[in-house]
């Protein structure tokens, strides 16, 4: 199914509750610049609408909840760890705000896992740096019994 860029742009603006600039480019991954308020979405050939919706939800989470400061420099926390924790934090918050995104995130991460998008199949986790291992742990852990929205991946992954 073809991704309709204008529809995804409007979705992002509606979820963000502001007139952010949405760009569709041939880039490796999605990103949101908290200073310029620009959301960049990748133009992946084989990305489903569900995966793009998840990327929109994730990046809008940054638009809504990531502060426009570099506070971690003052406390000397490596940025790779800040990124991992911030991604988990904003995903939890965006899914609380828009409860319908729970299923979108679940299905999209399941699809990415099935396609080995993260290129981890048949790899030894001990070869990855600590921040990546923490991120994969957050992605691949089963949901908490009290809050299924805490996990970003299906428990079967």
What are these regions (language model features)?
Residues 140-147:
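Conserved small/polar residues in nucleotide/adenosyl-binding loops
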Residues 61, 147-150:
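Short hydrophobic/aromatic residue motifs in ordered secondary structure
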Residues 152-155:
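Hydrophobic alpha-helical segments, chiefly the membrane-spanning helices
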Residues 1-126, 135-139:
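Basic/hydrophobic alpha-helical interface regions
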């Amino acid at each position: 199914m073809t991704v309709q860029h204008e529809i995804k742009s409007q979705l992002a603006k509606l979820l963000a509750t502001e007139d952010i600039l949405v760009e569709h480019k041939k880039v490796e991954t999605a990103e949101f610049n908290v200073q310029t308020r620009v959301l960049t979405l990748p133009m992946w050939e084989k990305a489903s609408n569900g995966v793009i919706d998840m990327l929109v939800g994730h990046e809008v989470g940054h638009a809504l909840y990531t502060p426009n400061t570099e506070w971690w420099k003052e406390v000397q926390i490596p940025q790779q760890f800040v990124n991992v924790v911030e991604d988990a934090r904003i995903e939890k918050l965006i899914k609380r705000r828009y409860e319908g995104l729970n299923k979108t995130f679940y299905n999209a991460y399941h699809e990415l896992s099935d396609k080995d998008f993260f290129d981890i199949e048949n790899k030894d986790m001990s070869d990855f740096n600590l921040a990546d291992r923490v991120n994969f742990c957050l992605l691949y852990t089963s949901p908490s019994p009290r809050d299924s929205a805490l996990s970003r991946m299906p428990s079967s992954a």
